[in-house]
Amino acid sequence: TPLTAMRTNLEVLATLDLPDEQRKEVLGDVIRTQTRIEATLSALERLAQGELSTEADQVPVDITELLDRAAHDAMRVYPGLEVSLVPSPTCIIIGLPAGLRLTVDNAIANAVKHGGATRVQLSAVSSRAGVEIAVDDNGSGVPEDERHAVFERFARGSTASRSGSGLGLALVAQQAELHGGTAALEDSPLGGTRLMLRLPAPR
C-alpha cells in the first residue's frame, strides 16, 4: 500500500547513509506517495460531503459560465493543455455549484493524467428534457468494456496511470446521481473519450 511504501522509504532514510543522489530519489518517492495519500483523503472527504447534500442546497447555476471558468483554470493548472468552450446560449439549471464544478474538473484531470490528453473541449446543450454537459478529449480513451466499471470507487482503468486515488470518476457519478441524472463515457469526436453528464430539467 502507499503507506507501507512510505514507511519503507523512511526506514531506509533513517538507517542507511545514502549518497546525496539516492537520498534525493528516496525523498522524491516519499513526497509523491504523500501527495497521493492526501489526494485520496481529500476525495473521500468530498464523497462524504456529497452524501450529506440535500435538495435545499441546490441553487440556480449558470453552466455556460461554470464551463468558461473551468476551462481557464484548467489551462493554468495544466500548462500546454488547450481547453476550448463550444459557444452556446446561456444555460441555467438548478443544482449544486461546487458539485457540478467538481465534476468538470475531475473529467479534465482524468483526461490529462490518465489519457494523456493535450486538448479538451467543453460543451453544454439545453432542452426541455434538461441539459447535457460534454467533456471531450483527444487522449488515449477508455476501453468500451471498462467504461461502466471506472465510475466505481477505487476502480482504475487499464489505461490509467499509477498515480491517483481511483475516486475521480466515482465523484462524477455521485454528483450525477445527486442531480437526478447520469454520467457515461463515450467515444469522442476528438479521438479520445467523451464524458457525458445528462441532468434532467427541474420538475
Predicted segments with their positions:
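Conserved catalytic submotifs in the C-terminal HATPase_c
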Residues: 59, 80-92, 190
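Short beta-strand/loop element within the Bergerat-fold HATPase_c
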Residues: 119-129
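Short acidic helix/loop segment immediately C-terminal to the autophosphorylated histidine
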Residues: 14-21
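Glycine-rich ATP-binding loops of the HATPase_c
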Residues: 180-186
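Short helix-loop "hinge" at the ATP-lid/N-box region of the Bergerat-fold HATPase_c
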Residues: 111-115
